[in-house]
Every structure is written in C-alpha cells, then in structure tokens.
C-alpha cells in the first residue's frame, strides 16, 4: 500500500513539475546556468590547485564553498562554522626493493609500481615479509548467502598471504541470482578483499589485476600506490601487514610454475564449492612508511525542517581532488572541473531552490561536501559516525559525482539500479522533463561502491546516484557512448579536466538541479521512508 501511495504522490508532483502552480515550481525557477557556471569556474580555478586536501588551494576552495553556503542562507554545522574537521592519517609508502616470488621453478623479481603495489594501514615505519607462504583463495570471498567461503580449511592463515581474483564470481554471467550476475556486488571491491583478509587474520592479500574486473587499468592502481589516507579512528581497518596488487601476467606465471592455469582457476573459483589451496611458493617484500596526522574539513550546511523532526535528506558532492599529476602538454594541474566542481555547483543551486520556498520542508535538508572522497570517501565515513542528524533517520542520500558538461540528456542513468523504490519515484519525476531512467550499462565495474553515498548505504540508508549520461538530447546515444569512452581515456583524473568557458554547456547540469530538487522535495515532505528492494544486499542492514 505504501508503494502505491508514494507513487501516487510522485505522479501528482510530476504533473505539476513543468507548470508554475505550486511553490516548489516557483522555487525551482531561481536555478540558472549563470550560477552553475560561476560556481564551477571558481571551484575548478587554478588558484584552488586541484583541491588536494591539506594544500593552500584546498583551503581556498573550502573557504569559497562555505562563503556560498552562507550566502545562500544555509545554517552552519557548528556554531558559526560550516566546517566539520576530519582527523586524517596520511601515509606514504616506498618499496625500495623488488618483490620476490619464489616458485618451484624460479624466483620472479617484480619492480614496484610495474609488477606490483603494496601498502599497509598499520602505523609502522617498516614492514617486511620474508618468504611468507602463498595460497590461492579464489575471489577471497566469504558469502554465506551464496554458500561460498574462499578461506575454508586453510591452516595457519596468520602466516600466509592470499592471492585472490579481482571482482566477484558473477562477472560475465547473465545469472543475476548468483552474485547479481555481471553487476558487481560489494564482494567484488578491492576494499572488501582487504577487509575480509583482515577478518580472516592472514598476513596479506594480493589481488590479481585485470582491467575489466577492476573497472580501471593498471595505471590507476599505480597512481594511488604511493600515498594513502585513513580516518584516524579507522586507521587499522585494513590491518593486514600487506595489502597489494599484482599484474595479471605475473599471477599467470606464478600459478603456471605451480602447475595451474589461471583461466581454469577463475572458472573453478566461481563455483560455490571452490576450496582454497596452498601454493608451493613464497613472497618477500619490504615497505617503508611515513605518516602524518592532519585535519581536513567536510563543508556542511543545512536548512532546518518545519516539522520539528530530526529526520533529514542529504545531498552530497565531494570537494576534494588530486592536486598535481603527470603533465599533459606541460600542464600538470588536475583542476577537477567535472570531478567534482560541477557537483558542488549542483548542490549549491539546489540549496538556493530550497531556500526560495515560502515554507521549509518537513524534514531537514543537509548539504554535505565531503573531503577525501578520492582516497576512500573518508570525509563521508567520518560524517556517518558523527552526523548532524541521526543516520537511522536519514530518509535518503542524493549524490552527484563526475558530470561532463555536454548539454541536456534524455536519460537518467542510475548506478545501483534495482536497490530501492527510489528508482520508481525518480522515473515518475523524470517523465515531465522528457527523460527516462535506465540502469548503468557498466555496472560490472562496481561504481555504486566507489563514491560518497556508499558509507550511508553501508548503514542501511537508500541512495540515489544518478545522472544524464548515455543519451545526449542533441547528439544521441552513439555520440554519448563515444564521448564517455573518450572522457575515461583522456579526461578523468587528468589535467585536461578543466573548464572551457567558450564550449561548456551547463544546460544538462541545470536539468539535474531541477530533477533532483524535485526528488529531494518529495522525500523531505512525505511521511515514511523509501524502501529497499528485498533482494538488495543492503535490505536488512537497517530496520525502520
């Protein structure tokens, strides 16, 4: 019955979404391309130095965001401050020697960053493994609901290092009843592999890299290998002495020297009854670590609800980026215009729409611009532990992350499609704009687990992570497909991600402001909460 009521409310709201007959429609009209352009160009400006946390440029960026939150009329998170300080431990790792894999046939010598990467969250200046025994643990998964335990039966795991396959057993499958088929589950994320290894008490975990399974090439693994960040209270979360990656061809040779074929093992490891086994091989590696304790702020403002409630709706758009990187045509500054200056502009403009309402929504509206998303959404992890309003009373979170300025779109691509009834609500709201919802066609890469909404999801809060992406209104689907491929190859996390005042088309971003204001407005005024799909892996986390 609740589903019918909510869809009815969404339909009634959608009927008026393109008119001017209610206060929300009038409030929406304050949104403008000019504001979005001004915000984006300021946050992606060279003076912000790529917004790497702890830099002078980052200080300028968060200061600007706080000023704009105040100008919009948002209430500060603490006293008169819009900053929520997040205690961070920054670590830098250098591996001064090759990793050595001793097999029955040879010793493989791997150069750091080329054949392997290694790090540890342990606060120790030096970590050395000498001839630690290796074992093959399939996908490194313990999933009782699928009858799978890739660590079952291994003796003395505390002395050994697990070699595991990236992603999960559903990769490439059309059977959605088993690990969601080709749609990655959290079991497929690298973060989970290290977490599970720590729970099993192993000495280390080495993930076998493969582009499609990881969702990115080796260059991304290599780029993040030198430095890591942790929320200080969480610094032992991945507490194996060794967390690392090895190139696929290295793993292929290692296993061949032990009498196994990697492709056959991948097929075997997909089965529920797969059992791990020891390899007649060892690993030796040395890591030298330096640490620094610092603080970096989340920027948070909110609009108090009119219903005297501690319930809330949360909008997300992270402010941090990468600073400097490998130069392209002499430019090494990674401005982060599409990742994620546009999302902060989107969030600020939605805030302006809410402030333009003659009466505040029933629920509180929180606008959270977290720090350290690029290093594991640390700011959001901290926020869910220290929230402005109780996490169990957050109706939903709405997140935008990575949005190229290509103009209007017909689609609304939902990453994490099928997890909750937010999908059907959004479908109704999108229709008056001539838009339709669709699942992310690249869900195998686990993008749902790779942005700031995910710490909320882990606490049982439904999330909407969506945007126009696959069907450009002016140029069509094939053009969009070509642009997406070009974006990942030439712009994402590169100095080319900057504003282009003469050609940037903000009309698509304005679409997202209007649509997701509509969604937030409905969530902020309805009774009850969105519902998880009973088949979602997060359906039973939070009961309410």
Located regions from the model:
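C-terminal motif of bacterial Sec signal peptides marking the signal peptidase cleavage site
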Residues: 15-17
């Amino acid at each position: 019955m609740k589903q019918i009521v909510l869809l009815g409310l969404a339909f009634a709201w959608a009927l008026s979404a393109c008119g001017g007959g209610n206060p929300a429609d009038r409030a929406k009209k304050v949104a403008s391309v000019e504001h979005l352009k001004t915000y984006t160009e300021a946050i992606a400006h060279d003076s912000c130095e790529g917004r790497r946390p702890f830099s002078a440029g980052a200080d300028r960026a968060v200061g600007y965001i706080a000023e704009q939150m105040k100008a919009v009329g948002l209430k500060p998170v603490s006293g008169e401050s819009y900053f929520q300080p997040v205690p961070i431990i920054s670590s830098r790792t250098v591996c001064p020697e090759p990793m050595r894999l001793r097999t029955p046939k040879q010793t493989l010598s791997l150069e750091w960053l080329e054949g392997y990467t290694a790090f540890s969250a342990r606060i120790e200046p030096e970590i050395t493994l000498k001839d630690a025994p290796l074992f093959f643990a399939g996908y490194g998964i313990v999933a009782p609901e699928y009858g799978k335990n890739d660590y079952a039966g291994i003796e003395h795991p505390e002395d050994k290092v697990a070699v595991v396959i990236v992603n999960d057993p559903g990769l490439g499958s059309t059977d959605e009843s088993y690990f969601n088929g080709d749609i990655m589950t959290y079991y497929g994320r690298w973060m989970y592999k290290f977490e599970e290894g720590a729970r099993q008490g192993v000495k280390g975990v080495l993930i076998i890299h493969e582009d499609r399974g990881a969702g990115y090439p080796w260059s991304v693994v290599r780029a993040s290998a030198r430095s890591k960040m942790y929320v200080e209270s969480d610094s032992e979360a991945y507490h194996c002495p060794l967390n690392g990656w090895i190139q696929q061809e290295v793993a292929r040779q290692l296993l061949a020297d032990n009498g196994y074929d990697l492709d056959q093992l991948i097929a075997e490891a997909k089965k529920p009854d797969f059992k791990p086994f020891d390899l007649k091989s060892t690993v030796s590696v040395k890591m030298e670590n330096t640490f620094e304790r610092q603080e970096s702020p989340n920027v948070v403002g909110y609009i108090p609800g009119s219903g005297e409630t501690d319930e809330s709706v949360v909008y997300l758009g992270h402010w941090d980026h990468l600073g400097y990187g490998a130069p392209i045509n002499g430019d090494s500054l990674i401005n982060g215009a599409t990742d994620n200056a546009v999302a902060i502009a989107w969030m600020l403009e939605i805030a302006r729409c809410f402030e333009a309402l003659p009466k505040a929504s029933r629920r509180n509206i929180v606008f959270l611009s977290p720090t350290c998303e690029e290093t594991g959404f640390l700011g959001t992890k901290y926020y869910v532990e220290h929230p402005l309003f109780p996490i169990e009373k957050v109706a939903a979170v709405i997140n935008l992350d990575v949005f190229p300025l290509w103009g209007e779109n017909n689609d609304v691509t939902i990453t994490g499609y099928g997890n909750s009834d937010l999908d059907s609500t959004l479908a109704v709201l999108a229709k008056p704009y001539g838009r339709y919802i669709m699942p992310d066609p690249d869900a195998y890469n686990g993008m749902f687990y790779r942005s700031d909404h995910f710490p909320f999801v882990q606490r049982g809060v439904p999330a909407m992570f969506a945007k126009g992406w696959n069907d450009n209104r002016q140029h069509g689907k094939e053009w969009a497909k070509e642009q997406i491929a070009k974006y990942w190859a030439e712009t994402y996390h590169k100095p080319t991600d900057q504003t282009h005042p003469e050609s940037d088309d903000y009309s698509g971003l304005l679409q997202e402001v209007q649509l997701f204001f509509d969604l937030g407005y409905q969530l902020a005024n309805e009774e009850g909460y969105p519902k998880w799909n009973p088949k979602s892996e997060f359906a039973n986390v939070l009961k309410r």
